[in-house]
Amino acid sequence: MADKNFLTEIIDADLAEGQIREIHTRFPPEPNGYLHIGSAKAIYINWSIANQYGGKFNLRLDDTNPAREGEEYVNSIIEDLHWLGADPNGGIFYGSDYFDKCYEYAEKLILEGKAYVDDLTRDEMREYRGSDAGKPSRPSPWRDRTPEENLDLFRRMRAGEFKEGEKTLRAKIDLASPNMNLRDPAIYRIKYAEHHRQGNKWCIYPMYDFAHPIQDAIEGITHSMCSLEFENHRPLYNWVIENIFGTEFPKQREFARLNMTNTVMSKRYLRELVEMGIVDGWDDPRMPTLCGLRRRGYTASSIFTFVREAGISKSDNLIDMRQLEACIRSELDLTAQRRIAVLDPVKLVVDNYPADKTEYFDIANNPNREANDTTTRKVAFTRELWIENEDFAEVPPPKFKRLTVGGEVRLMGGYIVKCESVEKNPDGSIAVIHCTADLETGNGNPADGRKVKGTIHWVSAAHAVDAEVRLYDKLFTEANMNAIPEGSDYKDYLNPDSVVVRKGCKLEEALADAKPSDKFQFVRTGFFTPDSKNPGVYNRVVTLRDSFKPAK
């Protein structure tokens, strides 16, 4: 079923009025950082709407600020869109493709008396513009320069005759407007920095609010959909479109950005976490970046499901991270094959089982009925096994249903065993658990009909694969990182237990050839994926269960 929301209602009305025939959208990230889960919402909205209406979707790299952008980010953005399945059928473009056109249109505004070169510094300009709290604006002493003088100065700006900040091109709009964005905004500034695509061809660069509507219009974008913080920029967007192109389209429309609990979305904060070594790069599995989520084991489909379930509205809200976890958990419960992994191993010896014998039990790859997976795999069983430390208790607590001295449990898919005795290390910890097996129970229940309540998982010691397992959790302890007290340091809220590393884990041998793209449920433990950077390391995608119930 097609998604319906306030944006599609706007589009339906525009189509009904015959103003447009084909929907054309775009996603215009600045290549100065890696995309994150919030970016996925903007991608989904623009891509899905174009897809829903049989239109076109562009990717435009908004590389109008040469000081902060680079090919590393360009490549990562393109890779992320491809991974999400949101390939731009309208094409891939760069903001810098339109520098010549932006310059041409700036000269047009100058000649029409709608733009002027200002000598005020940035601080002086801020002072002269006043404030939206009632402080009136004042015209710059250079506001009434003639078009001829402004054109000469602007061309000299381009020729590199002035220092950074010495001259600025401003649009001449309305100094009395209550909207600060219309009080003669800067539309070109001097910047001496090598551009990643244009080199040193330019030393003046268009401001975002000027370049963006021009880029949209040139590409034939019909609906420029962006997050809510640009709502009060819309009158400036419209001014540029009307005064340069004389049309009503493109139309800018805004939606609420995606905010999620226990994380930060600010590129500045994310960059600090990387540069300070607090996380292991932009793709650290604790990061909200798409590459981090991908390395963690999230799928593109689970991310788009999350975005869709979070909804599209004009009201800011905070989405519980557990809703994202619920999306991937539901998906992997159906798609992930089951494997056995012992994360905190202790040796179990079946004393009445031959030391030189190996047999194989058929164990289901995915017992979830909805998965419709009837396949099995063979799991080796030998005299010496590994089980979880927590599955044995010498002095069991109340309602403990796992292994105890004198007690019985079912080894998952295998025999019922009874603990006869234990060996201990010098520090008192358990070294070896000695058991006997009821060798008649390999394919069913005991002949005498006795009930065994507990079932535990295990791995053959002779066939086990050694691995490191990383148990990831939320990066910050505070749910709403946008509401921390003013003046406090966001790093004070870092979760010291955001990752717990388990070394010496024992995995079943079927995992020896696992690839980073593979996803598994480690039975009774959680969902895991091989790390893409470190062979022999597994990342926990998400726990097996949570009390969170997503809204229907």
What spans do the regions from the language model cover?
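A glycine-rich helix N-cap at a beta->alpha junction
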Residues: 73-100, 105-106, 113-116
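Substrate/cofactor-recognition hotspot
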Residues: 306-552
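Conserved short loop/turn motifs at secondary-structure junctions
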Residues: 28-32, 60-68, 91-100, 123-124, ...
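N-terminal catalytic cores of NTP/NDP-binding nucleotidyl/phosphoryl-transfer enzymes
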Residues: 3-12, 16-79, 194-227
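Active-site cores that bind ATP or allylic diphosphates and position pyrophosphate for catalysis
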Residues: 63-65, 71, 108-270, 328, ...
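Intrinsically disordered or highly flexible coil/loop and linker segments, enriched in small
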Residues: 20, 115, 163, 180, ...
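Secondary-structure transition/capping motifs at alpha-helix termini
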Residues: 16-19, 48-56, 82-89, 217, ...
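Long, charged, mostly alpha-helical binding arms that flank functional sites
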Residues: 250-327
